[in-house]
Amino acid sequence: MIGAFKRQLLSNLAFIFLFSFLFAVYCQSAIFFFDNAEAVRENTAASSDFTERLILLDAGHGGEDGGTVGVNGINEKVLNLETSAALEVYLRFAGFEVVQTRTEDVLLYDKSTDFKGRKKMLDLAERLRIAEELLPDLFISIHMNSFPDGKYAGLTVYYSPNDERSRVAAELMRASVVEHLQPDNRRELKRAGSNIYLLDRLDTPSVLVECGFLSNAEECELLCTKEYRHKLSFVLFSSVSSFFEE
């Protein structure tokens, strides 16, 4: 009887602890968002045209394609999607129209076609089709980086060579990150080559953001926290709003 009571008590305590933890995480995220709400308004006060601006967010990988794997075992695809979702919150709050290429853990290929050995290519082709159909004012692809040597860290921005405004957007993103989040970041902007499928083919302003190195233990740990992803997303949002005020 006593053993059953203790098991029930421990079960109840575990539930209370879990609920308290999840509530604390929610409150922390909410506090960060509302603490920055005034900053969002200040960022958008200079322009009344944001409601006419379409941002296409592209969370890289998904489904069967997990992307790179962090030192702690996290799949890149998860962090890409969560970072894109956080960025969307700030953009929408400021009045931007936002579309995501994916909002679920999926690869974007037609499962009714002959996809064997072609899933990744079909996925990229579908993302390209979406972007060419929507013609966004800015295309932002979200990814995470990795390298065999775990000493490397820091956000990196690639820009499309097909529209000069892509480099402008990338420069603003890098500058904002250095000023507000990573003051020691010395990573240079990178012009996308043919190996970056989407940026090589898109004619609209397009950037790809490698948010950090999952091969670096410290940075991987940061990127796995909701608080840091929201800070990063806010910094990226700030640069996007500056881009449309240029």
Task: List where the protein language model places each region.
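Catalytic-site microenvironment of enzymes
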Residues: 1-246
